[in-house]
Design a protein with these regions (language model features):
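Alpha-helical segment proximal to the catalytic Tyr-Lys
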Residues: 133, 176-181, 238
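Active-site helix of classical SDR
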Residues: 128, 164, 172
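The beta1-alpha1 cofactor-binding region of Rossmann-like NAD(H)/NADP(H)-dependent oxidoreductases
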Residues: 44, 66-78, 110, 223-224
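Conserved glycine-rich cofactor-binding loop
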Residues: 12, 19-21
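Residue(s) in the substrate-gating loop at a strand-loop-helix junction
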Residues: 148
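Substrate-binding pocket helix/loop in short-chain dehydrogenase/reductase
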Residues: 103-105, 109-115, 143, 198, ...
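C-terminal helical subdomain
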Residues: 187, 208-236, 240, 247-249
Length: 252
């Protein structure tokens, strides 16, 4: 076994929601461990800035792609762009997501419901199938979905999001069976991480809640997703598929 269990030299990783937050951390970690990366999000300028950083810091190739994963035609274009540029994809991370706020369950419109489902579940299904089938034909690949502890510990303020993320957990198990043995499919289930999104939180109230409800008594630091992501993306997890790995400070 190689000294670096997380070695990704010359592999190609596609990361949706890759320009910020946990996605950004994973992009940088994959590049640091030798991978070329495809950075996808709705904000092309952010993707391009991170692609330039990857090249400057690690000397790896990085392709920026604008993509709204809730629209299948854009998902298909993302897959085609990755294969046109690199000829293959070894790692897919379905990280893009959204959890909009609402005043009450009755205030959730059909448009909002569909938007949350489209981004958090429908797009994950489509991109996993489009790239996963090509991975299977190529004889290898690793898909890493990103759900949330909301899937198993929902709150009233995120019901639709929790439904979608529970679907991602189920989809992970289903795709592991459908795409194996060539392709492994696993899932990260993060708890609360102090990414840029956390700037909108009442951090004092969150800190108090964390002390009461989480064994580690704090939110996650963005870089703390990296170890789990590298494990599932790399050959270190070669006998792991269909698994959901909590990275939540013990919350769930």
């Amino acid at each position: 076994m190689p000294t670096d269990h997380f070695d990704l030299t010359d592999r190609v990783a596609v990361v949706t929601g890759g320009s910020r937050g946990l996605g950004r951390e994973m992009v940088l970690a994959f590049a640091e461990h030798g991978a070329d990366v495809v950075i996808a999000s709705r904000k092309l300028d952010n993707c391009e800035a991170l692609a330039a950083e990857v090249d400057e810091r690690f000397g790896r190739r990085a392709l920026a792609v604008e993509c709204h994963v809730g629209h299948w035609e854009q998902v298909d274009r993302l897959a085609d762009a990755a294969y046109d540029e690199f000829g293959r994809v070894d790692i897919l991370v379905n990280n893009a997501g959204m959890s909009p706020l609402y005043d009450s369950l009755a205030s959730v419109t059909e448009a909002l419901y569909d938007k949350v489902m489209d981004v958090n579940l429908k797009g994950v299904f489509r991109l996993s199938v489009v790239i996963g089938e090509r991975m299977k034909a190529d004889g290898r690949g690793s898909i890493v979905n990103v759900s949330s502890v909301a899937a198993v510990r929902p709150t009233p303020g995120e019901v639709v999001y929790a439904m979608a993320k529970a679907g991602v957990n189920n989809l992970t198990s289903s795709l592991a069976k459908a795409l194996g043995p060539e392709v492994r499919v696993n899932c990260l289930m993060p708890g609360p991480f102090l990414t840029d999104i956390a700037q909108a939180w009442d951090l004092e109230a969150f800190a108090e809640t964390a002390r009461r409800t989480m064994p580690l008594e704090r939110g996650g630091r963005p870089h703390e997703i990296v170890g789990a992501a590298l494990y599932l993306a790399s050959d270190a997890s070669s006998f792991t598929t269909g698994s959901v790995l909590k990275v939540d400070g013990g919350l769930a």
